[in-house]
Curated annotation (Swiss-Prot):
The lineage of its organism: Bacteria, Pseudomonadati, Pseudomonadota, Alphaproteobacteria, Hyphomicrobiales. Disulfide bonds: none annotated. It comes from Rhizobium leguminosarum bv. viciae. It comes from the Bacteria. Belongs to the HupJ family. This is Hydrogenase expression/formation protein HupJ. The gene is hupJ. Gene3D superfamilies: [NiFe]-hydrogenase assembly chaperone, HybE.
Amino acid sequence: MDAESHDVAAIDPALALGLQLEMRYREIYATAMADVPICNPALGVAATGFRTYGGRALGIVTTPWFMNLVAADLPDGVPTGPAATGTTLRVNLPAGEVEFIAGQLDAIGRIDSCSLFSPVFEFATMEAALETAEEAVRAFFDPATLEPPPAPPAAVNRRDLLRGHFRGREEASE
Protein backbone atom coordinates (compact mmCIF):
# COMPACT_ATOMS: atom_id res chain seq x y z
CA MET A 1 0.00 0.00 0.00
CA ASP A 2 1.22 3.50 -0.75
CA ALA A 3 1.44 6.62 1.45
CA GLU A 4 -2.08 7.67 0.48
CA SER A 5 -3.36 4.28 1.63
CA HIS A 6 -1.65 4.79 4.99
CA ASP A 7 -3.60 8.07 5.44
CA VAL A 8 -6.89 6.37 4.53
CA ALA A 9 -6.07 3.47 6.86
CA ALA A 10 -6.21 5.90 9.77
CA ILE A 11 -9.92 6.26 8.96
CA ASP A 12 -10.83 2.88 7.42
CA PRO A 13 -10.35 -0.09 9.79
CA ALA A 14 -10.40 -2.61 6.91
CA LEU A 15 -7.49 -0.85 5.19
CA ALA A 16 -5.66 -0.67 8.52
CA LEU A 17 -6.09 -4.41 8.96
CA GLY A 18 -4.80 -4.94 5.41
CA LEU A 19 -1.66 -3.01 6.37
CA GLN A 20 -1.26 -5.14 9.51
CA LEU A 21 -1.54 -8.29 7.40
CA GLU A 22 1.11 -6.92 5.01
CA MET A 23 3.49 -6.28 7.91
CA ARG A 24 2.87 -9.70 9.44
CA TYR A 25 3.43 -11.56 6.17
CA ARG A 26 6.60 -9.54 5.50
CA GLU A 27 7.89 -10.77 8.87
CA ILE A 28 6.97 -14.34 7.94
CA TYR A 29 8.69 -13.98 4.56
CA ALA A 30 11.87 -12.65 6.19
CA THR A 31 11.97 -15.47 8.74
CA ALA A 32 10.02 -18.71 8.28
CA MET A 33 9.72 -18.48 4.47
CA ALA A 34 13.24 -17.20 3.73
CA ASP A 35 14.87 -19.39 1.08
CA VAL A 36 11.87 -21.74 0.84
CA PRO A 37 11.76 -23.03 -2.76
CA ILE A 38 8.01 -22.46 -3.24
CA CYS A 39 8.56 -18.69 -2.99
CA ASN A 40 8.59 -16.65 -6.18
CA PRO A 41 11.52 -14.21 -5.78
CA ALA A 42 9.88 -11.76 -8.21
CA LEU A 43 7.05 -11.10 -5.74
CA GLY A 44 6.76 -9.17 -2.52
CA VAL A 45 3.92 -8.84 -0.03
CA ALA A 46 0.86 -6.66 -0.65
CA ALA A 47 -2.71 -6.22 0.57
CA THR A 48 -5.20 -5.32 -2.16
CA GLY A 49 -8.77 -4.06 -2.09
CA PHE A 50 -9.46 -4.35 1.62
CA ARG A 51 -12.95 -3.28 2.58
CA THR A 52 -15.50 -3.89 5.30
CA TYR A 53 -18.05 -6.51 4.36
CA GLY A 54 -20.40 -8.33 6.70
CA GLY A 55 -18.68 -6.82 9.73
CA ARG A 56 -15.26 -8.18 8.70
CA ALA A 57 -12.31 -6.96 6.65
CA LEU A 58 -12.03 -8.71 3.29
CA GLY A 59 -9.33 -8.30 0.67
CA ILE A 60 -6.55 -10.10 -1.13
CA VAL A 61 -3.12 -10.78 0.31
CA THR A 62 -0.33 -11.51 -2.15
CA THR A 63 2.93 -13.04 -0.94
CA PRO A 64 5.80 -14.78 -2.72
CA TRP A 65 4.14 -18.11 -1.89
CA PHE A 66 0.37 -17.47 -2.23
CA MET A 67 -2.44 -15.14 -3.26
CA ASN A 68 -5.49 -15.50 -1.02
CA LEU A 69 -8.80 -13.77 -0.54
CA VAL A 70 -8.88 -13.30 3.24
CA ALA A 71 -11.49 -12.38 5.81
CA ALA A 72 -10.53 -11.20 9.28
CA ASP A 73 -12.35 -9.68 12.22
CA LEU A 74 -12.09 -5.91 12.51
CA PRO A 75 -10.29 -4.83 15.71
CA ASP A 76 -13.28 -2.87 17.06
CA GLY A 77 -15.93 -5.02 15.41
CA VAL A 78 -18.06 -7.86 16.68
CA PRO A 79 -15.96 -11.03 16.59
CA THR A 80 -17.22 -13.87 14.44
CA GLY A 81 -18.14 -17.11 16.10
CA PRO A 82 -15.45 -19.66 16.83
CA ALA A 83 -14.26 -21.93 14.04
CA ALA A 84 -11.73 -24.72 14.40
CA THR A 85 -8.57 -24.25 12.35
CA GLY A 86 -8.99 -26.02 9.03
CA THR A 87 -12.79 -25.80 9.03
CA THR A 88 -14.37 -24.95 5.69
CA LEU A 89 -16.65 -21.91 5.92
CA ARG A 90 -18.98 -20.61 3.23
CA VAL A 91 -19.28 -16.84 2.88
CA ASN A 92 -21.83 -15.14 0.67
CA LEU A 93 -20.22 -12.34 -1.31
CA PRO A 94 -21.95 -10.19 -3.94
CA ALA A 95 -20.60 -12.46 -6.69
CA GLY A 96 -21.74 -15.66 -4.95
CA GLU A 97 -20.78 -18.13 -2.27
CA VAL A 98 -17.05 -18.58 -1.58
CA GLU A 99 -15.38 -21.27 0.53
CA PHE A 100 -12.81 -20.17 3.08
CA ILE A 101 -10.60 -22.22 5.40
CA ALA A 102 -10.51 -20.98 9.00
CA GLY A 103 -7.09 -20.30 10.48
CA GLN A 104 -5.11 -18.31 13.02
CA LEU A 105 -2.30 -15.86 12.41
CA ASP A 106 -0.05 -14.67 15.23
CA ALA A 107 -0.53 -10.97 16.04
CA ILE A 108 -3.75 -10.92 13.98
CA GLY A 109 -6.04 -13.65 15.31
CA ARG A 110 -8.58 -15.56 13.28
CA ILE A 111 -8.10 -15.23 9.55
CA ASP A 112 -10.15 -17.15 7.02
CA SER A 113 -8.52 -17.74 3.64
CA CYS A 114 -9.65 -18.69 0.15
CA SER A 115 -6.65 -19.74 -1.93
CA LEU A 116 -6.55 -18.13 -5.37
CA PHE A 117 -2.99 -19.11 -6.35
CA SER A 118 -0.47 -21.27 -4.50
CA PRO A 119 2.34 -21.30 -5.36
CA VAL A 120 2.51 -18.14 -7.46
CA PHE A 121 5.11 -18.93 -10.12
CA GLU A 122 2.73 -17.90 -12.93
CA PHE A 123 3.48 -14.26 -12.07
CA ALA A 124 6.67 -12.90 -13.65
CA THR A 125 6.38 -9.54 -11.86
CA MET A 126 4.76 -8.03 -8.80
CA GLU A 127 2.83 -5.70 -11.11
CA ALA A 128 1.24 -8.68 -12.87
CA ALA A 129 0.31 -10.23 -9.52
CA LEU A 130 -1.22 -6.97 -8.28
CA GLU A 131 -3.24 -6.52 -11.49
CA THR A 132 -4.64 -10.01 -10.99
CA ALA A 133 -5.40 -9.30 -7.32
CA GLU A 134 -7.19 -6.06 -8.20
CA GLU A 135 -9.30 -7.76 -10.86
CA ALA A 136 -10.09 -10.68 -8.55
CA VAL A 137 -11.23 -8.46 -5.68
CA ARG A 138 -13.43 -6.50 -8.09
CA ALA A 139 -14.95 -9.74 -9.37
CA PHE A 140 -15.72 -11.07 -5.87
CA PHE A 141 -17.62 -7.89 -5.01
CA ASP A 142 -19.40 -7.42 -8.35
CA PRO A 143 -22.79 -9.15 -8.57
CA ALA A 144 -22.60 -8.86 -12.37
CA THR A 145 -19.95 -11.60 -12.35
CA LEU A 146 -22.57 -14.14 -11.33
CA GLU A 147 -23.44 -16.53 -14.10
CA PRO A 148 -27.10 -16.30 -15.05
CA PRO A 149 -29.08 -19.31 -13.88
CA PRO A 150 -29.84 -21.89 -16.56
CA ALA A 151 -33.23 -21.63 -18.25
CA PRO A 152 -35.77 -23.93 -16.62
CA PRO A 153 -36.58 -27.03 -18.63
CA ALA A 154 -39.77 -26.91 -20.66
CA ALA A 155 -42.71 -28.22 -18.67
CA VAL A 156 -44.14 -31.46 -20.02
CA ASN A 157 -47.51 -32.52 -18.76
CA ARG A 158 -48.62 -36.14 -18.74
CA ARG A 159 -50.99 -35.69 -21.69
CA ASP A 160 -48.21 -34.22 -23.89
CA LEU A 161 -45.85 -36.96 -22.76
CA LEU A 162 -48.30 -39.70 -23.74
CA ARG A 163 -49.00 -38.05 -27.09
CA GLY A 164 -45.31 -37.50 -27.83
CA HIS A 165 -45.68 -33.71 -28.12
CA PHE A 166 -42.60 -33.05 -26.03
CA ARG A 167 -40.37 -34.34 -28.85
CA GLY A 168 -41.42 -31.53 -31.16
CA ARG A 169 -40.57 -28.95 -28.49
CA GLU A 170 -37.10 -30.38 -27.91
CA GLU A 171 -36.35 -30.49 -31.64
CA ALA A 172 -37.61 -26.93 -32.12
CA SER A 173 -35.38 -25.63 -29.33
CA GLU A 174 -32.20 -27.18 -30.79
